[in-house]
Amino acid sequence: MGARDCTPLLMLSFLLFPLGFPVLGAPARLICDSRVLERYILEAREAENATMGCAEGCSFNENITVPDTKVNFYAWKRMEVQQQAQEVWQGLALLSEAILRGQALLANASQPCEALRLHVDKAVSGLRSLTSLLRALGAQKEAISLPDATPSAAPLRAFTVDALSKLFRIYSNFLRGKLTLYTGEACRRGDR
């Protein structure tokens, strides 16, 4: 009864054991699945659309610095991978700071709208997840490996916004632009 009962269980465990191996490399490949990035882009667009017509409660009492999301495709394609990684990593860091600052300003507002707070909280969560996924893809290491003395490593271009709708537009544009370009190239390289 004892040995016979263990045999099917042992066989089942041998069958299921290899299924655990793909999970070890899942985070790096996860960002390479276009549906994952599309989900974050969709959330950013929803937040942008929700705040477009918003006047009351959507303006900040101070300016928030955000990354410039414009992409010169010719220059981008000629950039070294490390430069692209640095631009994306710095942009993501600045955008995270901006969203967190927006969250703090919204929390201190006299009558914060719960729907706006929900969109900001989702953006904070999304940026944390994207940061983790980019770290698994190696973006942080590539950005750090770029020598500071490289003349083509220009400082990140930035400007300020004064409203939640503008902040979400930048968030959406950054995800659709530089982040999508970088992850697409990093995933195509196939060494991840």
Curated annotation (Swiss-Prot):
Its main location: secreted. It holds the Pfam family EPO_TPO. Residues 1-25 form the signal peptide. One of its GO terms (molecular function) is erythropoietin receptor binding. PROSITE patterns: EPO_TPO. Produced by kidney or liver of adult mammals and by liver of fetal or neonatal mammals. The keyword Cell inner membrane does not apply. It is found in: Secreted. Disulfide bonds join C32-C187, C54-C58. The keyword Secreted applies. Glycans are attached at N49, N63, N108. Belongs to the EPO/TPO family. This is Erythropoietin. It comes from Bos mutus grunniens (Wild yak). The gene is EPO.
